[in-house]
Amino acid sequence: EIKACMECGFPANEIVFAGVGKADWEIELALNAGIQYFNVESIPELEVIAEIAERMGKVADVSFRINPNVGAHTHANITTGLAENTFGIAMKAMVGTIRTCSQFKNIRFVGLHFHIGSQILKMDDFEALCLRINELQDMLEAEGITEVKNINVGGGLGIDYQNPDENAVPDFKAYFQTYAKHLKLRPGQRLHFELGRAVVGQCGSLVTRCLYVKKTDSKQFVIADAGMT
């Protein structure tokens, strides 16, 4: 993905490398390219990045993905912010995690990353995330940790599959107003979003070919060469 981004013309210093499983060769590629930072999901991953960065004589900027234990009103299989999900580090472990990070001379802590799920249509879920982020920032500051430059709130804003023609454009206004109202950023902090589906979901067209028409007693089906739906 990093290679694909750069081949498409995106500057390496605007790329953030996320994902729960980063192979050594991918970490090396990212460090050589000079990406903006890594979203780190665990202490073992941090240790691997630190080891590779030291061997390469590089400094890796990292942001920690937090599991805020916030549920989302979406399908159970695409929630990512609950305690039982595989993603991120528990909030209660963050002070110790950041202090562990400071022990590595080739690692620089730059921010916090969150993502509570996909295809979310209720703004209450994003409001709950904001309140958890505020709680975490207060907790870190109480421990003297103030070097949080970036806050990445992930994405998750869904599109209306029930009435796609009537609501072709998601309610971006309500989405951004939720963060503007409820998220308490500190001076100089940068806020990052990972909007994907909401931006491009309605922008494509499926090009397919009719192979044949199948008739049954109750329905008529067009069989196409683009899948089984």
Question: Where is each model-derived feature located?
Answer:
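Active-site-proximal beta-alpha core segment in soluble small-molecule metabolic enzymes
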Residues: E1-N150, I159, L211, D217, ...
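C-terminal active-site-proximal or functional interface alpha/beta core segments in diverse enzymes
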Residues: S118-T229
